[in-house]
Amino acid sequence: MRARKATVELQYNGAAVKTSLKEFGEAFSYTDPAGGSSDSISLTVGDPRYQWISAWLPHKGDQITAKISFADRDGDDKTTTLDCGLFTLDDLSYSDNGGKAAFKMSGVSAPALDAFSTTERTQNWEKVTLKKVAQTIASRYKLQLVFDATDVAISTQEQSSATDSSFLNQLCNDYGLMLKVFRSKIVIFDREKYKKKDPVATIPREEMSSFSWNTTLAGSYTGGTITYTDPKTKKDVTYTTGGGKRLLKSSTKADNLADAKRKIEAAVTSANHGITTISFQTMGRPDLCAGQTIMVTGVGRLSGKFYIDKKTDSLTSTSYTSKIEASQVPTTSDAVIVDAIQRLAAIGVINSPGYWIGKHKSVKYLDDLLLQMATTILVNHDTGLYTGNPQEALDALVKYGVINTRDYWAANMGKLQYISDLICKAANALPEIIQ
């Protein structure tokens, strides 16, 4: 759905606000992050009769319930309502420039009880699970817990002079889970699981009024190493996942090897999220929300599947727009693999793209190999160092982080004609400095 107009419905401390953006409002925005922070709203209202600094003066801690009603742009008069939730005012400001007075209110979707985010606690959690910890904390503030992830057993975990909000958020981060507080709920979910879901919509470039894209290697990793002290033997234990030169190093508490393995894999995955990002603005999209995936098309090689990290709906008396901030999701869908093959052909790593388009499903993991090659190899340096030498070519690809499973490809190059040639050409494309 693409909305052509929208109106805001507000309840202030339980009472309906009998105003509209057209009468008083200048702007309203609703920000929906996927996790790591709470939903938020911002409302700017004109104050020509100075009511907002007298009888209507809001106070920090007051509560606002916000809903946005949308009319479909197709003109069928169908109305959809988006319940933004309950917000606690935490920031108020007022300005008066030459008689043009305005009052701005901002609020977050967090428990009204300040203790959740301000009161520090010290507690030793023993023989619990992450879900049990979250349920205990949620109950303190009369919040509902929504837990959509594989639970984690925790032998001991110290909460040392930390607020319940920061402690629970850090605990989720340690295990690669996302936390979000909204609509009187604490929601914990597995972002990697959500990234695997089917796209809910396709957004072509023609529907975007603006578009930006960024990618970087800074902060990305091909693996990680964790060192922890075994609680039973008191000896240091080191575990490494992945390979290559860009290893994330961690020294942290772990209950056992399985716990350490999950923590370092979560840390690497979290660090690699957001390596490639996009941001675009479109006509209001009430059907989209953070945590969903979308397909973006019409931007050449930048097209693909993306996970919505944040969505901001902005309304004025005359317009409604949505800003989407999203991270690319590596995928092996046909469209993305065809695009990867064409990119490799464009730089001379592949000579016959039609062959690979027809064969990319014939060998297990070939999709992933082609996608990783296209993502990593952007320029063909054509060193010629590995022509006719696929085994050394595999070593070079491992060093550069193009592949992690050398043994698999060493054993399976003969399953399809020209795989060894592809591996050699890909290695030749790497800059000589890393050889």
What is each residue range found by the language model?
Residues 336-435:
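Short, solvent-exposed alpha-helical surface patches in non-cytosolic proteins
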Residues 1-112:
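Assembly/oligomerization scaffold segments
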Residues 41-44, 107, 120-146, 159-182, ...:
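Amphipathic, non-transmembrane alpha-helical segments in extracytoplasmic/periplasmic proteins
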Residues 77-80, 100-111, 144-212, 217:
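Short beta-strand-centered interaction patches in the first periplasmic/extracellular domains
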Residues 83-93, 303-314:
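Short beta-strand-centered aromatic/proline hotspots
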Residues 32-43, 260-276:
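Short, basic/aromatic beta-hairpin or loop at an interaction surface
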Residues 100-116, 318-335:
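Short solvent-exposed strand/turn elements
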Residues 2-9, 15, 169, 178-270, ...:
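Acidic, small/polar-enriched beta strand-loop surface segments
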